[in-house]
């Protein structure tokens, strides 16, 4: 097995429906511009509220790794 290096970035996904969809949105969007995604780990879950305290959006902060192809 050859040696590999992975880069780790943080992303925040949002959804008006759920934290699960917020996390999935972040990974799906990252997959459009990053190749070889490997692992996504949920770091933090929170909600965006309006002035009356009603939930406007669910937010998921993720740590995502992908294979580094630097020289």
Q: Across the structure, where does each feature detected by a protein language model lie?
A:
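Short connector loops at helix/strand junctions that flank enzyme active sites
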Residues: 6, 37-40, 55-61
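Short, well-ordered alpha-helical segments
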Residues: 4-38
């Amino acid at each position: 097995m050859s040696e590999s290096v992975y880069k780790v970035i943080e992303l925040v996904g949002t959804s008006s429906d759920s934290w699960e969809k917020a996390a999935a949105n972040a990974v799906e969007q990252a997959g459009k511009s990053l190749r070889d995604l490997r692992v996504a780990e949920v770091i933090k879950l929170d909600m965006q509220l309006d002035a009356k305290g009603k939930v406007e959006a669910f937010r998921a902060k993720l740590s995502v790794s992908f294979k580094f192809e630097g020289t």
